[in-house]
Amino acid sequence: MEAGPHPRPGHCCKPGGRLDMNHGFVHHIRRNQIARDDYDKKVKQAAKEKVRRRHTPAPTRPRKPDLQVYLPRHRDVSAHPRNPDYEESGESSSSGGSELEPSGHQLFCLEYEADSGEVTSVIVYQGDDPGKVSEKVSAHTPLDPPMREALKLRIQEEIAKRQSQH
């Protein structure tokens, strides 16, 4: 019983049953393994960079719109006729001087964030009219009438809530 012709050395299989590393298929496998390892290293490195970036300092503007911020008023009103809370005072100064000198104490700081990401801050005092406050916000950030009315109602609720606390 003869198994057949014995393979010649270097032709089909080498003695010992090892793979022929010169074969083209093995080169493709090794190239794919190396590419996979390189890609895996890049992904792990990017994940490490992302974790490092999370520990950066917080942004300068507050993320919560109801965050109360204390801004002391100037004692000498004649030296500072404008309230620094109302930026771009061209719109607010033309509507009257009583808005610049609030009659009551500070209730809360209203911060409205527009769709563009711009934040408008207005301090609401005890005697303020919700309609005028919503007009101040819409002077900085254009609002359509239904949004302005909704903002007015929300300001009214917040004023009532804070006045009941004091």
Swiss-Prot record:
Instruction: Specify where the region named Disordered lies, as residue ranges.
Output: 32-107
* Name of this chain's protein: UPF0561 protein C2orf68
Q: Which residues fall in a compositionally biased region of kind Basic and acidic residues?
A: 34-49, 73-85
Biased composition of type Low complexity is found at: 91-104
The record's comment on protein family reads: Belongs to the UPF0561 family.
Query: Which species does the entry assign this protein to?
Result: Homo sapiens
